[in-house]
Amino acid sequence: MATVLASGVSADADERGLERRLEPRHEQKTTIAVFGDWPYNLNLLNNANLLLDSVNSDPEVSLVMHVGDIHSGSMPCTSAGTLPPIAASNPGWNQQIFAAFQKFKSPVVYTPGDNEWTDCHKSKESSSGKPLQELAAVRSLFFARPGWTLGLHDMEVYSQAKYFSPSYPADAQFVENMIWMDARTVFVTVNMPGSDNDGLPWSSVEDKTAREAEIAARTDADIRWLQAAFNLAEREHAAAVVIGLQADMWDPAALAAGGDGLDRYTGFVRELANQAVRFRRPVLLINGDSHLYGSDRPLADPSSATGKIHNAAAAANLTRITVQGSTNAPGEWLRLTIDARTPSVFSWKNVAYCVDPLTSCK
């Protein structure tokens, strides 16, 4: 029987749901490696050891986080669940990425991106998969052990598959959503892909009823999981909260003519803002999706360009980092240090491992 996390139901029920406490591995300070939108071509995959060696050789890295997109938006999906397999598909790609993840010495947390499921219907991905079938395949491979990370040395975490609200038993399907605590910081991942949160029609396999149901169920579950993370942070008197997801929910390219739009993120962003305001202490959001490294405070000023997009509450304590990804040079991973003894808690730098992902890494 699944253990339930009664987030938003009652404090007593929430306590019972998390009565089996997962002990943090570090009391005050830890360092993690974060990257996403990788590998975006065969050059990066063939040179995966450069990334692996760079991360594995850092003695302070205690965890690895991949924020989604395990191939580019012009590479095929796996035609999961389709027989015979779609000719243009690459059925073995996900397994190759899984094998690479397992070579990291530290626990690996991965949250799905749009390219490996949401966008598989697109012609630029060779119409090589049906979104829901591709998501099911991602879950069956990367999340085969609910409540455990990937990596050579795995780690137990809270998974929404086991810790879900009893009022919403269907949330158990979101095995990819995780929570853990380390260095007086609560970490949470949610499945929030690009392409306007799966808001784009599925081309030749479009089923609007199924797509809209998918968006609603997953986004609502993501919000409940986010609430659960902040509830845990309050109860444990955490110094900070870190959220990992794929989508750049303020991407200006998505708002430009012909862009994907950003409206399907608004409900989640508003809840994130509300939770950050209530929490008061530092909150860090890490995303990929738009590929170029940057950091900002997108909700600090409601009258700013980013503040106007979702009309959310002002949350000056929310910092956002977009990790370097795709084939942008140089190939980098983010070295994020969390030190609960410092006022800002977070510090980071980029570590290069590939000179030019498009041509030669060395």
Describe the residue ranges of each PLM region.
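A short C-terminal boundary segment appended to hydrolase-like catalytic domains
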Residues: 26, 332-362
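Extended active-site neighborhood of metal-dependent phosphoesterases/phosphodiesterases
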Residues: 81-218, 300-337
